[in-house]
Amino acid sequence: MTLQITETYERLRASHISRWGIVQTTYPQNIAEHMWRVWLLCRDWGAAAGMPQHTVRQACEFALVHDLAEIRTGDAPTPHKTPELKELLAGIEAQIVPEVAELEATMAPEARELWKFCDTAEAVLFLKVNGLGAHAYDVQHLLMEQMKRRLMDSVLDVEVQDELMFQFERTIKKT
């Protein structure tokens, strides 16, 4: 691990970078908690869907680092990320933590889809439990629709897609 990523992890430990700047919540989720919860979902749901271990491992590895750049940039709300802003942020993030950009560039498409599904699912689950008001409800449902659409358009086998949706729906009913 390079000095740059070690320093980034130290900042993560020492600071409280909150997510959900545009959505009122009962609890100020931080980036470390979010990445850990995405890791749990990748590990559990990937295995339940019968995905190869190396694919699940790759998604899990990325889940633990995917938002490290937000320690310096802050959390840019997804609804405000235009394609131009996404491209700009990707360039900035690659300069801040190049290891994360390198890891993402080498991810298998199936691992990327598992991670992205779990990343969005974690946000939906967090808002279901902690979101306050109509805006939080609207954002939760917008994210859920985006997640479902992306999954249907993904490279994942239909059986894997079905199992991931089953795991998500079972989890959201329990919350």
UniProtKB/Swiss-Prot annotation:
UniProt feature coiled coil, ranges = none
Cofactor names from the entry are:
Co(2+); Zn(2+)
The UniProt record gives the binding positions of Co(2+) 1 as 34, 66-67, 119
- What is the originating organism of this protein? Cyanophage S-2L
Name of this chain's protein: dATP triphosphohydrolase
Tell me the function of this protein: Catalyzes the hydrolysis of dATP, dADP and dAMP into dA. This step is essential for Z-genome synthesis (containing aminoadenine instead of adenine). Specifically removes dATP and its precursor dADP from the nucleotide pool of the host, preventing the incorporation of A into the phage genome and favoring the integration of the Z-base into the viral genome.
**Protein keywords:** Cobalt, Hydrolase, Metal-binding, Nucleotide-binding
Q: Which Gene3D superfamilies match?
A: Hypothetical protein af1432 (1.10.3210.10)
Write down the superkingdom of origin: Viruses
Q: What family is this protein classified in?
A: Belongs to the Caudovirales dATP triphosphohydrolase family.
**Residues reported in the UniProt entry to bind dATP:** 19
Pfam families (UniProt xref): YfbR-like
